[in-house]
Amino acid sequence: MASSLRAAISKIKRDDVGQQVCPNYVMLRSSVNTKVVRNVVDYQIKTGGFFSCIAMLRPLQYAKRERLLGQRNLERIAARDVLQTRDLHSLCMPTPDAPMTNYQASTMRELVCDHFKVDHVDGLRYVPMDDRYSPSSLARLFTMGMAGLHITTEPAYKRVPIMHLAADLDCMTFALPYMITVDGDTVVPVAPTLPAERLLDDGFKGYGCLDISYGCEVDANNRSAGDQSMDSSRCINELYTAETAEAICILKTCLILNCMQFKLEMDDLAHNGFELDKVQMMIPFSERVFRMASAFATIDVQCFRFCLLMKDKNLKIDMRETMRLWTRAGSDDAISTSSLTISLDRGRWVAMDMNEVRLLVFPARV
């Protein structure tokens, strides 16, 4: 991001009121204001709200990118490339480039206190009330969520594939780690046996044994989710150790928080037409929201039903219909699909439309 901004400095212009702006530089569909004081460039990024960070799933640049994502040969990873605790911190912790509003920070803090059953002081520890949280922090987490984090105690799988941050959304693999049962043509989602929030209570130990499998792929030309991910990610060895345990906990906590924030925003939008119109101008909605909703292991049954409804309609619906589906997904006990056929085999569950694969589900084991 810093290099992107430096590259954009040469394009700085002044608007009608004399303020320096960067009109040709688009990040988060936001405005970038800069000022130069004693040859030091100061910048402020104004965004349109939480949903604007979805746009940052497109190419990002930040300091750790070369270290984390530069090498593709998975068989020749040097010891210096092993993911360090500080690297996980850099991916998960807040950055000062585009501060969250107090409303966003306080909302997330309330979610922490409520869902993790902690008091106000502990909530502040997870979501401090200052300017350190930013949309770019959230977007990096979303990007990792899209990749399908894979953490397990099996020695052969002690790694975390992370998608290349420059990958386009259409090339990403994302996680949909939910179990389903099928009764005729009715799909009934089943939540994981252990809520992910519970894993926060066992002194980080739960994160070492949490297996979030590769998730869902859409129209992937018959290539497995694992193959897709490995093509554009690196394999990071020996992730869960005494040194990295705390960082893994922070990573998982941030993913959980962002999932909760996403759910909260979806519920707010479902009942707020004015905000809905503003978001509609920001992003192509249906498929992006589907990919967002299917990106996290901690999303509940409502989000899973929502994903199935979206796929059943082939994502060709407008935003208001999307929000109606979201509301419906929260009230229905099961989802009846008009054309999907569900098959369970070889460790993955496939939803077929006629002979075309529409949805692959790789269940999570917690």
Curated annotation (Swiss-Prot):
Signal peptide: none annotated. Residues 1-11 are annotated as: Important for ssRNA-binding and formation of complexes. It is found in: Host cytoplasm. One of its GO terms (cellular component) is host cell cytoplasm. InterPro entries: Reovirus_polyG_pol (IPR002507). Keywords: Host cytoplasm, RNA-binding. The keyword RNA-binding applies. GO terms for molecular function: RNA-directed RNA polymerase activity; single-stranded RNA binding. There is a strain variablity in the inhibition of the host integrated stress response (ISR). There is a correlation with the abilities of the strains to prevent upstream PKR activation and c phosphorylation. Homooligomer; in presence of RNA. Interacts with protein mu-NS; this interaction allows the localization of sigma-NS to the viral factories. Interacts with host G3BP1 (via C-terminus); this interaction induces the relocalization of G3BP1 and other SG proteins to the viral factories periphery. Protein that binds to ssRNA and participates with protein mu-NS in forming the matrix of viral factories, which are large inclusions in the host cytoplasm where replication intermediates are assembled and viral RNA replication takes place. Plays a role in the inhibition of the integrated stress response (ISR) to escape from host cell translational shutoff. Participates in the disruption of stress granules (SG) through its association with host G3BP1 and mu-NS. Belongs to the orthoreovirus sigma-NS protein family. This is Protein sigma-NS. It comes from Reovirus type 2 (strain D5/Jones) (T2J).
